[in-house]
Amino acid sequence: NWNFSIQDEKEEEEDNLSEVTEDDILNMFTHVSPCKCKKERITVDMATTGEDNFVMKHWVGFHCDDIQYCMKNSNLEAVKMIKQFMVKHGLTDKELIIDVQGNGFLKEIFNLVSANGGGVAFSGAIAATAKGKKLYERFKDEAAHLATQMIKAGLITYDRQLAKMRYTHQKLKLESSTLTAEQMQFESRIFKFKRLPSGRIQFEGKKEQHALIKGFSPDLTDNIIMLCGGLCYDCYRELAGATGGEL
């Protein structure tokens, strides 16, 4: 669909039952990070289809200060861009969090075995962590729910100037681009969960997510989910500190 515009979508707004509101997203660009965690990380969301964007973000703890994306690239070009982004921020393999579902070859190029001092090979399909296994079906459910809580608690933050960074996508109208903050507001409608008969929490499936955001892939928000998965125990600590309780 070459004729899609996020502005058109605003005019025919439907009920948005997402747990993350557009205001929650805007608030991320107006706060200085309150988090104690200062671990530097690079999250990488590979483009898995011809219409996804390849998106990388640099984080200091849960504060993002740099975003780079590409609409069209080969696997080789993606690897080169990841390496350049690492050099730019002075980081090594051990600070990487890469979504490897459908991109297993990356595990051979980068050291993504954390037990061997490497980075995180993010795979949402694996089991939830020891801390989350009673509450979540899969790791993706846990990471997405942690991301939701972190956003709502004001613990995920972005440099203000990134809100006005131009962002474009193959599915947007040819002549149009949007702003990063607007695209993230649009993508935020994916943050929907249901309670299974087992009592566990399940995140909206990929197919449903695509329907909620008109066939787009949530490339910008996926990076937040990956960060919260890669630093899940830090998330639990930050949330406990922010709420004054044990999570």
Identify the function of each model-found stretch.
Residues 39, 54, 94, 221:
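Residue-level detector of short, conserved catalytic/binding motifs and their immediate flanks
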Residues 45, 99, 219-222:
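Acidic active-site catalytic centers that drive phospho-/nucleotidyl reactions
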Residues 45, 55-57, 68:
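Conserved RNase H-like, two-metal-ion catalytic cores of nucleic-acid enzymes
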Residues 60-200, 242-247:
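Mg2+-dependent endonuclease catalytic cores in nucleic-acid-processing enzymes, primarily RNase H-like
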Residues 37, 48-55:
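Short, flexible loop/turn motifs enriched in small residues
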Residues 44, 83, 148, 224-225:
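Generic hydrophobic alpha-helical scaffold/packing signal
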Residues 3, 13-25, 68-72, 166, ...:
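Acidic two-metal-ion nuclease catalytic site recognized across multiple nuclease folds
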Residues 1-44, 58:
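ATPase catalytic-site recognition across NTP-hydrolyzing enzymes
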